[in-house]
């Protein structure tokens, strides 16, 4: 019994360190290295043509600054955490977790929805959904659970969110038959 206690005591810090691992961000261009072909599903070009790719840039406008001011913020929209949380990936993480290719200007990018990819980016890891999730890939049971974290009535520019209609414009699945 005492031996079990010491074994648990010895491994407990390792367990907590592993469970609290923060994954690094690699940026859209790194994700796009594999996710740009027709065989893979053209995810990069779908994202590039979406409003998500421009989300951060909208915060650099006078209109965005006016909205931030009306909401009572003393900072420009592009400097306001309440705006950045829905308009940029990686805005609130330690700079050491931002890879060389990561650009906040890329707005709502791959890693906003799919999780920071440094630890699941390799083909070997990506071939296993279980390994990918262990290494930071986020998987949602229902797509809307992710979308409504930003597309909701708390947003100062909220309009009726039509999930099915909007998802049809940006869905970017990996084809089941990649032959």
Regions found by a protein language model. Give the residues of each.
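Functional cores that coordinate and move charged inorganic groups
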Residues: 112, 154-155
């Amino acid at each position: 019994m005492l031996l079990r206690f010491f074994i648990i005591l010895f491994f407990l810090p390792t367990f907590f360190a592993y469970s609290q691992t923060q994954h690094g961000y690699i940026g859209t261009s790194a994700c796009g290295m594999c996710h740009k072909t027709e065989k893979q599903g053209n995810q990069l070009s779908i994202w590039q043509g979406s409003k998500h790719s421009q989300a951060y840039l909208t915060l650099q406008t006078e209109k965005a600054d006016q909205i931030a001011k009306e909401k009572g913020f003393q900072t420009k929209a592009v400097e306001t955490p309440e705006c950045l949380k829905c308009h940029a990936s990686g805005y609130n993480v330690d700079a050491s977790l931002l890879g060389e290719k990561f650009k906040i200007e890329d707005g709502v990018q791959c890693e906003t929805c799919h999780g920071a990819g440094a630890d699941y980016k390799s083909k070997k890891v990506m071939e296993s959904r279980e390994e990918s999730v262990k290494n930071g890939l986020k998987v949602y049971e229902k797509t809307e659970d992710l979308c409504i974290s930003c597309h909701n009535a708390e947003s100062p520019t909220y309009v009726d969110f039509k999930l099915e209609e909007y998802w049809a414009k940006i869905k970017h699945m990996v084809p089941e038959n990649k032959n």
